[in-house]
C-alpha cells in the first residue's frame, strides 16, 4: 500500500552524512520525497512509497545511525503523490 512517511530525527544527526545516506537508500528502495537539515539540529524526512519500502528506509537509517539518533518522531499519512524522486533539500 502506498503511504507517506514524515519523520523528525533528533540527536547528533547533522554533519555525519545522514542526508546523503537517506538519499541513497531511498533511491535504491524506490522511495520519493526529500530530506533536509533543520536549524534546530534535527533532520526532517518527508517520503512516499510502498509501506514496506518506507519501513526499509527507517530500518536502514536506524541501523546506520543508531548511535547518533536520540529520537525519531514518525507520522504515517495518506500520500499526496507529489514527488517524482528523492532529493536533499537545502
Give short role names for the model-derived ranges.
Residues 1-90:
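Intrinsically disordered, low-complexity, mixed-charge
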Amino acid at each position: 500500500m502506498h503511504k507517506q512517511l514524515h519523520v523528525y530525527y533528533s540527536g547528533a544527526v547533522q554533519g555525519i552524512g545522514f542526508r546523503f545516506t537517506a538519499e541513497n537508500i531511498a533511491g535504491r528502495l524506490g522511495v520519493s520525497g526529500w530530506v533536509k537539515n533543520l536549524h534546530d539540529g534535527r533532520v526532517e524526512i518527508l517520503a512516499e512509497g510502498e509501506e514496506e519500502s518506507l519501513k526499509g528506509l527507517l530500518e536502514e537509517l536506524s541501523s546506520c545511525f543508531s548511535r547518533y539518533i536520540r529520537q525519531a518522531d514518525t507520522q504515517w499519512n495518506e500520500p499526496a503523490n507529489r514527488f517524482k524522486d528523492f532529493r536533499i533539500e537545502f
